[in-house]
A protein has these predicted regions:
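Rossmann-like NAD(P)(H) cofactor-binding subdomain of soluble oxidoreductases
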Residues: 55, 61-70, 74-146, 162
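Alpha-helix C-terminal capping/helix-to-coil transition sites in glycosyltransferase folds
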Residues: 70-71, 188, 240
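NAD(P)-dependent Rossmann-like dehydrogenase/reductase catalytic/cofactor-binding core
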Residues: 196-197, 225-235, 243-338
Length: 338
C-alpha cells in the first residue's frame, strides 16, 4: 500500500482519488479552496463536477499543502493547466528528493511554450516527474467504467512502479518512455476537439469529424516528430485514443466549447457557458507559436486560432481548410511508376 496525495478537487482529482482508494492505497485529497474542501468533508460529493460519485470517508480532504505532502510516496497533480506552475511553486519546499509526482493535466504553458512536465521540473527540480494520459473522462473513471491509459516517466523502474499503483480491473495502464509525445498528444488534441465541436455546432456530419480527427493526428504527429517525439506514440492511447474520445464525447468540455462557437457564441461566451477550464483555448495559441518555431504546417490549429482570437467565422475557416492546395496524403510513399 502506498500513501498518495491527490492535489486538485475537480472531477479528475476526485475520480483518481476514488480509484486509488479502491486500489487499497491511503489517499489524501487537497483542495486550494477552503469552501470546496468544507463541502467535500460534509457532503462527500461534488455535485457540480462529479454528480453521483461519493468520496469515501477514509479519504481526508485537506487545505494545508504541507500536511498533504508530508511523507507521501506519490503526488498526483490534478489541477488545471493554467495553475500548474503556481501550484508546483507552492509545492517545492515540501517535496523531498526523488518524490514521485504524476501530472494528469493536459496543456502547454502559453508564456514559455513548455510542456507541463517541464514546468513542474523547473519549479521542483528535486522531484521525479511522470505523466498519466489517455482517453479517460473523469465521469466514467469515477463510475468505475473500463478505461485504459498510458504512463510515461524518465525511467522504466518509475513507470512500472506507477503502473502498479494505478492498475485495477477497471483501469488498465500501459507504459512508454516517450514523455514528450504523451504530453503533446494530450495537449494538442484539445485544440483539434475545439475544431470538431465547432463542426458539430455548424451542423456538419460524421464525415467532417472523421476528417478533422484523422488530419488532426497527422498535424500533431508532424509537429511531435520535428520536436523529437516518437511517431508511434501519436497512434496510441495518448494520441489518437485521447483525440477520438475528446472529439466525440458528450463529456468533453473542449468539444462543448467548440460546439457553442459553431452555434455563434464568442470564445469568451463559450468558456463562461462551459463553466470549467477549456484547456484547448490555452493550448491553441501556444501550439501555433511552436509550429511556427519549428516551421511545421498545421492548418487546422491555425484556423482554430483565427476563429478564437481573430474573430474569423467558423464556417469560413472550414471552407478555407477545404480549399487548400491539393496534397498527397502519404508523401513518404513512392509511386510504383515514379
Amino acid at each position: 500500500m502506498a500513501k498518495i496525495s491527490v492535489l486538485g478537487s475537480g472531477s479528475w482529482g476526485l475520480a483518481l482519488a476514488l480509484l486509488l482508494h479502491n486500489n487499497g492505497h491511503e489517499v489524501l485529497l487537497w483542495s486550494a479552496r477552503p469552501e470546496n474542501a468544507r463541502k467535500l468533508r460534509e457532503k462527500r460529493e461534488n455535485p457540480d463536477r462529479l454528480p453521483g460519485v461519493r468520496l469515501p470517508d477514509e479519504i481526508d480532504v485537506l487545505t494545508d499543502l504541507e500536511r498533504a505532502l508530508k511523507d507521501v510516496d506519490v503526488t498526483v497533480l490534478a489541477v488545471a493547466s493554467p495553475y500548474i506552475r503556481s501550484t508546483a511553486h507552492k509545492m517545492a519546499s515540501f517535496v523531498c528528493r526523488d518524490q514521485k509526482i504524476v501530472n494528469v493535466a493536459k496543456g502547454i504553458e502559453e508564456k514559455t511554450l513548455k510542456t507541463l512536465s517541464e514546468v513542474i521540473e523547473e519549479e521542483i527540480p528535486q522531484g521525479n516527474v511522470a505523466v498519466l494520459s489517455g482517453p479517460s473522462h473523469a465521469e466514467e473513471v469515477g463510475r468505475g467504467l473500463p478505461t485504459t491509459c498510458v504512463i510515461s516517466a524518465h525511467t522504466q523502474e518509475t513507470a512500472e512502479y506507477l503502473q502498479s499503483i494505478f492498475m485495477s480491473p477497471v483501469f488498465r495502464v500501459y507504459t512508454t518512455p516517450d514523455i514528450l509525445g504523451v504530453e503533446l498528444g494530450g495537449a494538442l488534441k484539445n485544440v483539434i476537439a475545439l475544431a470538431a465541436g465547432t463542426a458539430d455546432g455548424l451542423g456538419y456530419g460524421d464525415n467532417t469529424k472523421a476528417a478533422l480527427i484523422t488530419r488532426g493526428i497527422t498535424e500533431i504527429g508532424r509537429l511531435g516528430k520535428k520536436m523529437g517525439a516518437q511517431m508511434e506514440t501519436f497512434y496510441g492511447l495518448s494520441g489518437i485514443g485521447d483525440l477520438i474520445v475528446t472529439c466525440a464525447s458528450k463529456h468533453s468540455r473542449n468539444r462543448k466549447a467548440g460546439y457553442l462557437i459553431g452555434q455563434g457564441y464568442t470564445m469568451e461566451e463559450a468558456m463562461k457557458e462551459v463553466q470549467m477550464v477549456v484547456e484547448g483555448v490555452y493550448s491553441a495559441r501556444a501550439a501555433r507559436e511552436i509550429a511556427e518555431k519549428y516551421e511545421v504546417e498545421m492548418p487546422i490549429i491555425t484556423e482554430v486560432n483565427r476563429v478564437l482570437f481573430e474573430r474569423k467565422s467558423a464556417a469560413e475557416a472550414v471552407m478555407d481548410l477545404m480549399l487548400r492546395d491539393k496534397k498527397v496524403e502519404t508523401p513518404m510513399l513512392p509511386w510504383e511508376n515514379a
